[in-house]
Amino acid sequence: MNSSSASITYASRKRRKPVQKTVKPVPAEGIKSNPSKRHRDRLNTELDRLASLLPFPQDVVNKLDKLSVLRLSVSYLRAKSFFDVALKSTPADRNGVQDNCRTKFREGLNLQEGEFLLQALNGFVLVVTTDALVFYASSTIQDYLGFQQSDVIHQSVYELIHTEDRAEFQRQLHWALNPSQCPDSGQKMDEANGLSQPAVYYNPDQVPPENSSSMERCFVCRLRCLLDNSSGFLAMNFQGRLKYLHGQNKKGKDGSILPPQLALFAIATPLQPPSILEIRTKNFIFRTKHKLDFTPTGCDAKGRIVLGYTEAELCMRGSGYQFIHAADMLYCAEYHIRMIKTGESGLIVFRLLTKDNRWTWVQSNARLVYKNGRPDYIIATQRPLTDEEGTEHLRKRNLKLPFMFTTGEAVLYEVTNPFPPIMDPLPIRTKNGAGGKDSATKSTLSKDFLNPSSLLNAMMQQDESIYLYPASSSTPFERNFFSDSQNECSNWQNNVAPMGSDDILKHEQIGQSQEMNPTLSGDHAGLFPDNRNSDLYSIMKHLGIDFEDIKHMQQNEEFFRTDFSGEDDFRDIDLTDEILTYVEDSLNKSALGCSGYHPQQSMALNPSCMVQEHLQLEQQEQRQQHQKHRAVEQQQLCQKMQHMQVNGMFANWSSNQSGPFNCPQPDLQQYDVFSDVPGTSQEFPYKSEIDTMPYAQNFIPCSQSVLPPHSKGTQLDFPIGDFEPAPYPTTSSNLEDFVTCLQVPQSQRHGLNPQSAIVTPQTCYTGAVSMYQCQPEAQHSHVAQMQYNPTVPGPQAFLNKFQNGGVLNETYPAELNSINNTQPTTHLHPSEARPFSDLTSSGFL
C-alpha cells in the first residue's frame, strides 16, 4: 500500500499541441514512397477529421493530442447513446419499442445544453460510473477546479480526489455503501491509485429500485484545484443519487450484453459558498496567447469584454509588458523567466491596463506550449480580481520583494530614476521652463538607446496619463472652473446692488473680468476652444460632465446668491464693547442694589397682590436705603448716553422668548425720591426737553420694563467721546411726570433675551433717558414720535438710517422676552388708557 501511495499522481495538464501538417506534393510516378509514412499520414488525416467532429471549441480542439482525440470520441459516443435511451419517457421505449409520433416530435426539438442553466448552478455536473470513470463533466468545472472539460472526461476520478478521500468516494459509489462485499467474480486492483475496483456487474433485480431513498447520496470530499494556490484542493459537496446508465451496450466475458449499471449523478458545489464578487468574476476567466517574449498574439471573447480591446488593438502595440503596471513589471518578469525554465509560471497577481486607462487586478497562470520538442508560444489564463483582493496580494508581495523604482525607494540606493519627467514624483522645474525642455530632450534621446524588448522601453512607451490620471482628474477641473466661477459670481454680486458713484467703476471691473474669463461669460461652446482632444476634456467626458453641466452649476450658484444678496450682514458692523460694558455694569449694580434680587425667590407677578400693605412697607424700606445711590448712577448714565446720540440701542422686541428673566422691581412710588434728594434739579439738566413731551398722570405696574435685546447678533456702532454734562436743566418732578407716560399696559409682558449684551431692571429711568437724544445744542427740537409696532419694523430700516448718517429712529423688530416682578406694586395714579397712542414704547432699553 505504501509503495503504491508513493507513486500516486494527480491530474494535470498533459496535452501537447499536434504538429501542424503541411500538404506535400504527390511524388512523381516511379519514385518509391515509404509505406509506413503513408500509413501515418493517413492516420493523422483521419484523426484531424475526427477531432473536427468533436463538440468542443476550435481553440480546445487544436490543443488535443491523438490519444485525447480518441478518448473524447469514445466518451461522446457513449454520452450520445445514453441520451438516446434516457430521453425516452417509458420503460417500453427504453427496451426498443419506439412510438412513431413521439419520435417525429423529438426530432423537431433541438435539445442542447443550456449555457445559462449551467451558470445558474453553484457548481458543476459530474457523472461517475461504478468503475470510477468520469462519464460526463459540465464545462463549468473550469470555473471551480481550473481543468478543462476535455481534461477530465473519460479519465479516472481518483486523479482529481485527495488521497485521504478516495476510499470514501469509492464507498459512495456502491449501492450498499459497502464495496468490500463483492460477489464471486472477485476484484481488480488499481495500482496507480491503490484502490480495488469491482470487476463485477450487478443485475437490476439484485439492487434496490432506482427511485429508492437508499440511492440518494450527499457527501464531501476534496478535489484537485488548479485555481487554489494555498493547498491545491477545494472541498466540494456532492449531492445526487445513483441511477442506471442506459445504452452502454457493454458485453461480458462470454459475449453477452450486460444490463445497465449504476452511476453517480451529482452536482458538486463548493463547501464554502463563494461571495457575490467571486460569483461575478468567475464567469470572466479569459485566455490570451503570447509569443515567448510575452507579445500578445490573440485573445478570446471574454478577454475582449474585460479589457475592452479588440484583438487587433491588443496585438499591434508590441510587448505585452506595455499593458502591465510599472510596479508589477519586475514581478511578472521574474515569473516569466520561471515559466521559460519550468514550462509553467504558477499563479501570479498583477494589474493590467484596460482600454479606458484603468487598472484591473487579474490572477494569471501562464504555461508554455511546445512544438517539435521546443517552446512555441505562451497561453495565459487570467481571472479578474476585485481591488480589495489585488491590494491584499500587493501587500503580501511587498513583504518579500526588494525596493523598487515604482515605490520611490530606489533613492535610498542612489539609483537613477528611469521614469520620464512627467512621471517623476519630484520634478525639477525652472521659471522659464528650460529645465523641462532639456529633460524632455534627454528622455527622447534615452529612448533611442533603449533595447526595444527591455522592460524600461516598455515602460517608457506607456502613456504618462495612466499613472497621473486618478490624481489629476479633479485638479484642473477645479482650478479652471470653480476658481473662475467664484470670481465671476463675486463680480456679478457687486453689479446687482451698485451704490452711488461706484457704478461706473464696478461696471468696468465686470467688463474686465469678462474679458479675462471669456470661457465663463460667453457661450459654453467657447469653453476651451480647439481643446476637445485635451486631457481635461477627456477627464470631464469620463466623469460624465459636459459644458452644459458647468453652465447649470454657475446658474444655480448665481440663483442662490440672488436669494441672499438683499440681506445685509450686520455682523460687519463693529460693536463698541466699552460703552455697552459700562451701561451693563451700571445697570446691574443698581438692579442688585435697589431691589435685592434673589433668583431663587423669584415668582410670577400676581395683580391681586398689588394691594397688600406689607409688601409696600418692604419696598419703602428698600427705597430709603438706595435712593441717593441710584440718583448718582442715573446721572452718570445720562452723561454717557448723551454722547451716544441715539434714541435706542437694541433692535428687536420679542414676545415669544422662552425663559423669563425674573427680577424684583420697586414700586412706582420710588420716583418721589427725586424731590427729597437735594441737588436733584442741578444733577439732571434735562428740563427743557422733558417739558416739551406730553404725558398722562397714570401709573401701571412696571414689570415690563427691561432692555429689549437686539436679535440674532445685530451689532450697532456708537461714537465714543468724552463724557460732558449737558447744559440743560431739569427737575425731579418733570422727570417723574415723564416716567409715567412711558408705562405700557399691564397685560403686556416683555421678556429679555439672555443673549443680550445689556440687562437692567431700571425701567423708568432708562426709558426716560433713551426716549430722546441728549444733544448739547442750544435749540431744543421736539423729537418725532413713532407709533409702537413691535412686529413690523426690521433691521433693514435701522441699517439704512445708520448708513445714511441720520438719526436712528425707534424701530425694532418684533422680539419680546418676558420678565416677572416678584414684588407687586401699587398705583400712584389710576391705570387709564394712554392718551398718546403714537408714543413709542421702544424707548425701553
Curated annotation (Swiss-Prot):
Cellular component, GO annotation: cytoplasm; cytosol; nuclear aryl hydrocarbon receptor complex; nucleus
PTM characteristics: Mono-ADP-ribosylated, leading to inhibit transcription activator activity of AHR.
Organism domain of life: Eukaryota
Positions of short motif Nuclear export signal: 64-72
GO molecular function: E-box binding; Hsp90 protein binding; nuclear receptor activity; protein heterodimerization activity; RNA polymerase II-specific DNA-binding transcription factor binding; sequence-specific double-stranded DNA binding; TBP-class protein binding; TFIID-class transcription factor complex binding
Region ranges (Required for maintaining the overall integrity of the AHR:ARNT heterodimer and its transcriptional activity): 50-82, 117-125, 265-267
Subunit annotation: Homodimer. Heterodimer; efficient DNA binding requires dimerization with another bHLH protein. Interacts with ARNT; the heterodimer ARNT:AHR binds to core DNA sequence 5'-TGCGTG-3' within the dioxin response element (DRE) of target gene promoters and activates their transcription. Binds MYBBP1A. Interacts with coactivators including SRC-1, RIP140 and NOCA7, and with the corepressor SMRT. Interacts with NEDD8 and IVNS1ABP. Interacts with BMAL1. Interacts with HSP90AB1. Interacts with TIPARP; leading to mono-ADP-ribosylation of AHR and subsequent inhibition of AHR.
Stated name of the protein: Aryl hydrocarbon receptor
Species for this entry: Delphinapterus leucas
